[in-house]
Every structure is written in structure tokens, then in C-alpha cells.
């Protein structure tokens, strides 16, 4: 089996930018698998990335935390010959569709073929009905769905779409320093990561929860060594962070709170949480923790 990976915003870019961002996303996937001591082989097609790995469950857990991935599906691969698709789909469906359940076949194609997407759905649907007892077709609210994606000379069969975090691949935008002090600041840093920012964590030496917050972010990003702020006075903290940022080519400071709004800074200050109320921030925090 393999894992079919889909991306979103990358597809809206020009060809050259899209190619560069896709290459970065593949590199991020390889790094994530390496960190998790899991082997993989990766190929790509226009709009899709294919991750081949022996450990599908672990692969899914790795991929669902990689920015730039909109969704992913564990899938089986076969040729685009309609008879081959039919055999593979029926074998696969026997593991997915239970006795007494309803099902639907959803198909789509890319490339030139002697059959239509509807032909695929009808043929596979009939084959499943003839192979599995006591099942029925329900296109509106099925108990199980069988998806078939035909892309040129290959076809992929799967039954679920697992959501990823979306956004842009980590590292495709500028480097920023994120001041980590509480849950809000973690959410702010996470949002910058989702936009492709290369985030360097900064925290106060006296913050006892810093290690906990950093661990949460590390599961979303292979963070570089964090910077420790010695001072506990806001204006001096800003100066320390600015000095560190320039030395490390960070173009801005990311904050999850507004105390620094009253402080003059020679670097841009980013407040990703502006426009979000406390309930929205709490919901996003729970999502980050849950997925992590």
C-alpha cells in the first residue's frame, strides 16, 4: 500500500513556484519520516504526492502533522486498465464494506482513457454487489465509500480522506522569531508555521512551562535550538529578541499577546491572533493539542 497525499494552496501558484513548493513539501515529508525512524519512498505527479511505506499507520500519523498537506488517503495501487481496477476494488471492498451495509463508489480521472468516470463507478459498483452478499448502493448517505482515482496509466483505490493541517509547506516563507510564553503564543507560532514561516522559538528563562510549549510545537516542526531571553522587563526583552533575530536573519517577531504593541521595535511585529476571540483561540489550541 501507499499513502496518497493532496495539497491545496500550492496548486494555486505559478508553475515555477508550485514546483519549488512541492519540492519543499517532499523534503519536509522525508525529514519527518527520518525523525520518526520510518522508511519511505516518495514519488510525485501533478497535484499528488505518493508516499510508499511499510508502516501505513505510522506514516499517516507523521503526514497528518505536516503543513501544506490538505488531506491524505491510505490506498492500493493498480494499473488504469478497467479490469485491473475492478479486481483490485472488489478485493479492497471486501475489507471495508460489512454485511448489511450500504456503499457508494466515487470515481474521478486524469488523463486519456477509453472509459469515463461514470463507467468506472458503474462497473465497480456492480462487481461489488455481485461479490459481497447483503449490501446495497446508497449514493446519498452510504455506510462506506470506495474512492477510485485514475491518473494516466495508474489507478488508486481508497476509502477515507484524512485531513491534514493545510497551509503552506514549512520553510517556504521567511524566518521569524516567535515569543513563547503561554497557550496563546503557541497558537500564534502554529499559525505562522501554517503560513510557511520558519519559526525560531524564543522564551523567558523563568518560564517553567516553556519546555511543555516547545514540545507541542516540536511535534509540528523540527524546531531549531530556541533562544532564551534573560530579562523579565518587556522593553529589554524586545531588545534581546531583536538582536537575536538580526543575528539569525529573522525578519519579524511573532506574538500571541498585545503587550508589545506599546513598545517601539525596529522589526515588524506580527500578531496572528488579531481578529480571533478567546473561544476561537481555545478551539484552535485544542485542535493543536489533539492532533499533536
Residue ranges of model-derived segments:
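Short, flexible loop segments at boundaries between secondary-structure elements
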Residues: 265-287
Amino acid at each position: 500500500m501507499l499513502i496518497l497525499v493532496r495539497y491545496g494552496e500550492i496548486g494555486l501558484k505559478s508553475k515555477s513556484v508550485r514546483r519549488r513548493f512541492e519540492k519543499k513539501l517532499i523534503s519536509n515529508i522525508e525529514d519527518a519520516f527520518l525523525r520518526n525512524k520510518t522508511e519511505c519512498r516518495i514519488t510525485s505527479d501533478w497535484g499528488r504526492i505518493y508516499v510508499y511505506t511499510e508502516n501505513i499507520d505510522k506514516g499517516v500519523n507523521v503526514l497528518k502533522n505536516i503543513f501544506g498537506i490538505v488531506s491524505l488517503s491510505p490506498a492500493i495501487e493498480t494499473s488504469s486498465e478497467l479490469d485491473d481496477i475492478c479486481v483490485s476494488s472488489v478485493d479492497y471492498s471486501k475489507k471495508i464494506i460489512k454485511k448489511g451495509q450500504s456503499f457508494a463508489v466515487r470515481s474521478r480521472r486524469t488523463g486519456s482513457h477509453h472509459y469515463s468516470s461514470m463507467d468506472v463507478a458503474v462497473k465497480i459498483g456492480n462487481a461489488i454487489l455481485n461479490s459481497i452478499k447483503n449490501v446495497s448502493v446508497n449514493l446519498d448517505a452510504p455506510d462506506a465509500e470506495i474512492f477510485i482515482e485514475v491518473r494516466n496509466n495508474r489507478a488508486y483505490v481508497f476509502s477515507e480522506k484524512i485531513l491534514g493541517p493545510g497551509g503552506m509547506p514549512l520553510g517556504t516563507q521567511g524566518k521569524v522569531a516567535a515569543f513563547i510564553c503561554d497557550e496563546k503564543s503557541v497558537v500564534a507560532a502554529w499559525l505562522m508555521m501554517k503560513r510557511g514561516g520558519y519559526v525560531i522559538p524564543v522564551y523567558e528563562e523563568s518560564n517553567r512551562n516553556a519546555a511543555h510549549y516547545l514540545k507541542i510545537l516540536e511535534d509540528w516542526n523540527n524546531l531549531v535550538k530556541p533562544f532564551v531571553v534573560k530579562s523579565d522587563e518587556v522593553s529589554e526583552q524586545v531588545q534581546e529578541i531583536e538582536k537575536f533575530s538580526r543575528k539569525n536573519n529573522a525578519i519579524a517577531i511573532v506574538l500571541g499577546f498585545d503587550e508589545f504593541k506599546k513598545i517601539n521595535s525596529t522589526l515588524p511585529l506580527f500578531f496572528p491572533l488579531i481578529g480571533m476571540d478567546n473561544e476561537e483561540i481555545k478551539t484552535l489550541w485544542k485542535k493543536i493539542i489533539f492532533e499533536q
